[in-house]
């Protein structure tokens, strides 16, 4: 879909079929904010704007792919896994007491926090622009559309059969969208509740 949109706007110089090329061209043509609003699925990435000398960290809408970042001893570190940060010579892992408290209360450490001091996690649906003065601009490109009226019992006026058809259509469309890939696609079904639905 994004490739088609870019083609309609005149871009037709594709070198391959990768998602990475599509992401780069979309950002180059539309700018990062407009481009990521069109991205769906699970992703996190970091991109350097060589013209403006700006670094952007981006995380998918639901936060499925993590992305950690922070300044440690005059070095800016980022990674999709905390264990990779521990490999850097500048990083000495120190537990953040506030994050530990959140973990004990919630059994997880919610973004923007991480378990380590001076390391943050990009929030879902967020772009973080890293500035030269070591500050960050956070740009929310997507937020969960919560409509209170749609959550009330009286607002649902479909029959069971209509709801079944709607759900089947939604699941079919979502699965079809996820099947588009530049590599072979497979699925592992465990037999659990989520695989059986």
Positions of the model-derived regions?
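Cysteine-centered catalytic environments shared across enzyme families
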Residues: 1-197
């Amino acid at each position: 879909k994004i490739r088609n949109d870019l083609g309609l706007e005149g871009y037709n110089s594709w070198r391959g079929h990768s998602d990475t090329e599509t992401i780069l061209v979309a950002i180059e043509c539309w700018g990062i904010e407009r481009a990521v609003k069109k991205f769906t699925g699970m992703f996190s990435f970091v991109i350097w704007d060589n013209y403006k000398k700006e670094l952007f960290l981006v995380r998918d809408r639901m936060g499925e792919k993590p992305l950690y970042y922070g300044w440690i001893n005059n070095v800016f570190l980022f990674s999709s896994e905390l264990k990779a940060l521990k490999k850097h010579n500048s990083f000495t892992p120190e537990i953040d007491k506030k994050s530990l408290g959140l973990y004990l209360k919630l059994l997880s450490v919610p973004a923007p926090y991480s378990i380590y001091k001076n390391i943050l996690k990009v929030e879902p649906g967020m772009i973080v622009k890293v500035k030269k003065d070591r500050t960050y601009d956070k740009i929310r490109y997507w937020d969960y559309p919560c409509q209170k009226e749609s959550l009330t019992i009286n607002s649902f006026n479909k029959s069971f059969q209509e709801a079944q058809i709607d759900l089947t259509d939604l699941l079919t469309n979502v699965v079809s969208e996820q099947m588009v890939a530049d590599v072979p696609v497979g699925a592992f079904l465990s037999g659990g509740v989520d695989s059986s639905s």
